[in-house]
Amino acid sequence: MENPVIIYVISDAIGETAQHIIRAVTAQFSLNKPADIRRHAFIRDESALLETLEEAKAADGIVVQTLVQAKLAEYATNFCVQNNIPNVDLLHTLTAAVEAKTGLKSKQDPGNMRRLDSNYFDRIAAIEFAVKYDDCKDPRGLLDADIVLVGVSRTSKTPLSSFLANQNWKVANVPLVPEIPIPAELFQIPAERIIGLTTTPEKLAQIRKVRLKSIGLDEASSYSSEKRILEELEYGYDTFKKLGCQVIHVEDKAIEETAALITEIITSYH
């Protein structure tokens, strides 16, 4: 089909759960155009819900709902059935199963998933930590980090730091440049807290050329030259060996996949 698949996320909270699942599902299809995901969050009454459902009907879309309140979920399901709209309820099949197994009733409180508890504030602190100690802005932060990522330029250190921070990990990262000495603090922390990131010369050259082009610089710069890349990668391997740290190849891996490998390694030491 030429037009993108339109998917309406309807939630009485933020709607992140549905959005993550939709992206995982649509990634399995060779779509001509990316799915058009339209998120409608904090739908807490029937009038707002009806307005969104009418919009989904007019757009010939798919409805994916994460409505905690059973009354609203039932309303949405009935509307979709009556109007022949594909509808997926991500919460209530599992909710019913848990109720049947435990004998307990769901609280049906949409805000319960996002309470400002200690976990929330820990996550905010981790995000602030990742920003403060990104790119080794202050080497002293390495001593307080749960995870330290080390690698040459364009090996996903910053995006991985951000992703892991959202999982409550305090992450610092250190760029490896042959001309710049390694901070002494890196040798003062346990090797099991350090993860080396590397990639293939071909992949690194490709990524660096794209980066140079995006900022209007010559793709033939030494930054993306084969000689320079091989020199940096070799320096990286020498550094990993000195540190005695685990090493992950990031080429052709999604950030989520690499992050999962990192947390698996880190938690295996505890």
Swiss-Prot record:
UniProt KW keywords: Kinase, Nucleotide-binding, Serine/threonine-protein kinase, Transferase
InterPro entries in the record: Kinase-pyrophosphorylase, PPDK_reg
EC number per UniProt: 2.7.11.32, 2.7.4.27
Positions that bind ADP: G151, V152, S153, R154, T155, S156, K157, T158
Entry's Gene Ontology molecular function annotations: ADP binding; ATP binding; phosphotransferase activity, phosphate group as acceptor; protein serine/threonine kinase activity
Keyword Kinase part of the UniProt annotation: yes
Bilayer-crossing regions: none
Major enzyme class: transferase
Catalytic reaction list: N(tele)-phospho-L-histidyl/L-threonyl-[pyruvate, phosphate dikinase] + ADP = N(tele)-phospho-L-histidyl/O-phospho-L-threonyl-[pyruvate, phosphate dikinase] + AMP + H(+); N(tele)-phospho-L-histidyl/O-phospho-L-threonyl-[pyruvate, phosphate dikinase] + phosphate + H(+) = N(tele)-phospho-L-histidyl/L-threonyl-[pyruvate, phosphate dikinase] + diphosphate
Pfam families registered for this protein in UniProt: Kinase-PPPase
Family, as annotated: Belongs to the pyruvate, phosphate/water dikinase regulatory protein family. PDRP subfamily.
Function: Bifunctional serine/threonine kinase and phosphorylase involved in the regulation of the pyruvate, phosphate dikinase (PPDK) by catalyzing its phosphorylation/dephosphorylation.
Name of this protein: Putative pyruvate, phosphate dikinase regulatory protein 2
Organism listed in the record: Listeria monocytogenes serotype 4b (strain F2365)
